[in-house]
Design a protein with these regions (language model features):
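Exported/periplasmic cell-wall-interacting domains
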Residues: 161, 300-407
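Extracytoplasmic/periplasmic, Sec-exported soluble proteins
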Residues: 61, 110-113, 157, 161, ...
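Gly/Pro-biased beta-strand-loop elements
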Residues: 231-338
Length: 407
């Protein structure tokens, strides 16, 4: 996982400024504990390392339906909790309530659904008034001898022109040809859409070039009773669709510290950015916005680094890769965008603590869609892998079509 870092807010004293800029070993991540203690440097009381506790654990799989879903804080209070359940590309809100003391959220109905993906977003204030956030996901148990596909994007969504239809299967698929034949992706106006397998449990679809704005895409899963592996059969028979919105493609030049935002081919704006520092450069290549969070927590320990940073309230965070590359607001290194690359692989835009629509980060967030393309050039790193997030646009058409299991 890779994420953007930063240093800290400025203080008047020269010593604090020196400590702050010495900490510019940026990085990104989401959810975790530990990290660079800038509040201690600035003389503020420390925040609890794990301010928001969510069970089941982030990334949990095959969670049993009797498991308790809880969001808790040891002090302060929960400000907002949003939980959704996704099944067959459809999102359903999970109703629940925060306790009178503000320390716990629990659902109205305790039993979890089978064969579903749950997403939890929580924001809390500690006893010193500092905001922190967590974003977690987990999937529940799929009955034995059955498999399902978790689908991207959501049903009835409006997406950017770089959206790739991605199916993540709950079981490894042995008969990939049979499963591939049972999935139908069509477009209006018509365009040739082809599949590509990444390993035994992921199947993606895309056209040769980015979708044209206004295209309506339909996905039909005819998986029920299809044998995906010996004795394991599909569970779904479902149709869903989405619409392609306007075209927005942004070009990040890591050497120039700029991002050109183009809407329908016309230059909308050139925005100053900070990319990965020399020791932790940003991936080159085409990446697609996978998720958008108004605020999230980023922590170095969740991306394989040490305790360099733990930023509880990163604003305007847009996920670009499965490994954790984000494009997000940066309030802790306000002089970096446009001048120097200081992150651990993310792309940072100038922002303020708490986020604001009047900043470059807020402006870009408000004008973006899941499915928009962000391309990075002139970074001293390799091209992002095509299975890292929705990175399939980094394969040419011949390479893409060679990934089909059907002759």
């Amino acid at each position: 996982m890779r994420h953007a870092l930063g240093s800290a807010r400025r203080a008047g004293a020269a010593l604090v400024a020196a400590l702050t800029w010495a900490a510019l070993l940026a990085g990104c991540s989401s959810v975790g504990s530990g990290g660079l203690d800038l509040d201690r440097i600035l003389g503020k009381p420390p925040a609890p390392e794990d301010a928001i506790r969510i069970t089941p654990d982030d990334g949990g799989r095959d969670v049993r339906p009797g498991t308790r879903l809880r969001v808790q804080v040891p002090g302060g209070h929960l400000e907002k909790v949003r939980v959704t359940r996704s099944q067959d590309a459809q999102d359903y809100p999970v109703p629940g309530r925060i306790s009178a003391d503000g320390l716990t959220w629990k659902p109205d109905h305790e039993r979890l659904a089978l064969a579903a993906r749950y997403t939890v977003d929580a924001v809390a204030l500690d006893s010193h008034g500092r905001r922190s956030a967590r974003h977690t996901t987990f999937t529940t148990l799929v009955p034995d001898e059955r498999f399902i596909a978790y689908v991207t994007p959501e049903n009835r969504s409006v997406v950017g022109t770089g959206m790739i239809v991605s199916l993540s299967f709950s079981r490894e698929i042995a008969d990939r040809a049979a499963v591939e034949r049972a999935v139908h992706v069509t477009a209006r106006p018509p365009v040739d859409v082809r599949p590509h397998w990444f390993g035994a449990s992921r199947l993606d679809f895309r056209p040769q070039r980015y979708w044209k704005p206004g295209t309506e895409v339909s996905v039909e899963l005819r998986l029920r009773d299809v044998q995906g592996a010996p004795g394991v059969y599909g569970l779904q028979y479902k149709r869903f669709g989405f619409t392609v919105g306007r075209s927005q493609v942004s070009l990040v030049d890591a050497a120039k510290h700029t991002m050109e935002v183009r809407r329908d081919g016309e230059l909308l704006a050139t925005v100053p950015v900070t990319a990965g520092a020399p020791k932790h450069p940003t991936y080159n290549g085409k990446m697609v916005v996978m998720d958008m969070l108004e605020v999230t927590r980023m922590n170095s320990r969740t991306v394989g680094f040490g305790g360099e940073y733990d930023i509880p309230d990163v604003p305007h965070a847009m996920k670009l890769t499965g490994s954790g590359t984000y494009l997000h607001g940066n309030y802790w290194a306000p002089d970096a965008p446009g001048r120097v690359n200081v992150s651990h692989g993310c792309v940072g835009l100038r922002d303020v603590k708490g986020g604001s629509s009047g900043t470059p980060a807020g402006w870009f967030f408000d004008r973006s869609l899941i499915g928009d393309v962000v391309e990075v050039v002139n970074s001293k790193d390799k091209t992002v892998a095509p299975d890292n997030g929705l990175g399939g646009w980094n394969l040419n058409w011949q390479e893409w079509t060679a990934g089909s299991a059907v002759d």
